[in-house]
Amino acid sequence: MNFRYSIDATNKFKKDIKRIKKRGYDMALLKNVINKLAMGEPLPAANKDHALAGNMTGYRECHIQPDWLLLYIIDDDCLVLTLTRTGTHSDLF
Protein backbone atom coordinates (compact mmCIF):
# COMPACT_ATOMS: atom_id res chain seq x y z
CA MET A 1 0.00 0.00 0.00
CA ASN A 2 1.45 3.34 -1.02
CA PHE A 3 0.43 6.12 1.31
CA ARG A 4 0.54 9.69 0.06
CA TYR A 5 0.51 10.99 3.65
CA SER A 6 2.43 9.77 6.67
CA ILE A 7 0.13 9.06 9.60
CA ASP A 8 0.52 10.71 13.00
CA ALA A 9 -1.81 10.18 15.96
CA THR A 10 -2.24 12.46 18.95
CA ASN A 11 -2.12 11.03 22.47
CA LYS A 12 -5.80 11.89 22.86
CA PHE A 13 -6.58 9.84 19.72
CA LYS A 14 -4.69 6.88 21.20
CA LYS A 15 -6.78 7.11 24.38
CA ASP A 16 -9.93 7.36 22.27
CA ILE A 17 -8.93 4.14 20.47
CA LYS A 18 -8.70 2.27 23.78
CA ARG A 19 -12.21 3.46 24.72
CA ILE A 20 -13.64 2.53 21.31
CA LYS A 21 -12.09 -0.96 21.49
CA LYS A 22 -13.63 -1.53 24.94
CA ARG A 23 -17.03 -0.66 23.48
CA GLY A 24 -16.61 -3.37 20.85
CA TYR A 25 -16.56 -1.18 17.75
CA ASP A 26 -15.30 -2.76 14.51
CA MET A 27 -11.75 -1.41 14.21
CA ALA A 28 -11.52 -2.65 10.60
CA LEU A 29 -13.99 0.09 9.61
CA LEU A 30 -11.75 2.76 11.14
CA LYS A 31 -8.63 1.28 9.57
CA ASN A 32 -10.28 1.27 6.13
CA VAL A 33 -11.16 4.98 6.39
CA ILE A 34 -7.68 5.90 7.68
CA ASN A 35 -6.04 3.98 4.83
CA LYS A 36 -8.17 5.79 2.23
CA LEU A 37 -7.31 9.15 3.76
CA ALA A 38 -3.59 8.29 3.91
CA MET A 39 -3.62 7.28 0.24
CA GLY A 40 -5.28 10.58 -0.67
CA GLU A 41 -8.44 8.87 -1.93
CA PRO A 42 -11.84 10.54 -1.53
CA LEU A 43 -14.17 8.94 0.99
CA PRO A 44 -17.59 7.61 -0.05
CA ALA A 45 -20.53 9.97 0.49
CA ALA A 46 -21.74 7.69 3.32
CA ASN A 47 -18.77 8.87 5.41
CA LYS A 48 -20.04 12.48 5.26
CA ASP A 49 -16.50 13.91 5.16
CA HIS A 50 -16.49 17.67 5.73
CA ALA A 51 -14.44 20.57 7.06
CA LEU A 52 -15.24 21.96 10.50
CA ALA A 53 -15.69 25.65 11.27
CA GLY A 54 -15.37 27.99 14.23
CA ASN A 55 -12.75 27.00 16.79
CA MET A 56 -12.22 23.75 14.84
CA THR A 57 -11.21 25.49 11.58
CA GLY A 58 -8.55 23.42 9.84
CA TYR A 59 -9.96 20.13 11.13
CA ARG A 60 -12.02 17.67 9.13
CA GLU A 61 -14.62 15.20 10.35
CA CYS A 62 -15.97 12.01 8.83
CA HIS A 63 -18.36 9.34 10.01
CA ILE A 64 -17.13 5.78 10.46
CA GLN A 65 -20.67 4.79 11.47
CA PRO A 66 -23.68 7.05 12.13
CA ASP A 67 -22.53 7.88 15.69
CA TRP A 68 -18.80 7.16 15.38
CA LEU A 69 -16.65 10.03 14.16
CA LEU A 70 -13.03 10.59 13.15
CA LEU A 71 -11.50 14.06 13.50
CA TYR A 72 -8.32 14.67 11.55
CA ILE A 73 -6.07 17.25 9.92
CA ILE A 74 -4.38 16.90 6.54
CA ASP A 75 -1.25 18.99 6.00
CA ASP A 76 -0.54 19.02 2.26
CA ASP A 77 2.70 20.98 2.74
CA CYS A 78 4.29 18.29 4.93
CA LEU A 79 2.18 15.39 3.59
CA VAL A 80 1.02 14.42 7.09
CA LEU A 81 -2.36 13.01 8.15
CA THR A 82 -2.85 13.76 11.86
CA LEU A 83 -5.52 11.70 13.60
CA THR A 84 -6.79 13.89 16.43
CA ARG A 85 -9.93 12.28 17.94
CA THR A 86 -12.38 9.43 17.45
CA GLY A 87 -15.58 8.57 19.28
CA THR A 88 -19.28 9.30 19.44
CA HIS A 89 -20.81 12.76 19.09
CA SER A 90 -21.21 12.97 22.87
CA ASP A 91 -17.56 11.93 23.40
CA LEU A 92 -16.23 14.66 21.15
CA PHE A 93 -18.61 17.61 21.39
Regions found by a protein language model. Name each.
Residues M1-P66, D75-L81, T86, S90-F93:
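Basic, Lys/Arg-enriched alpha-helical interface segments
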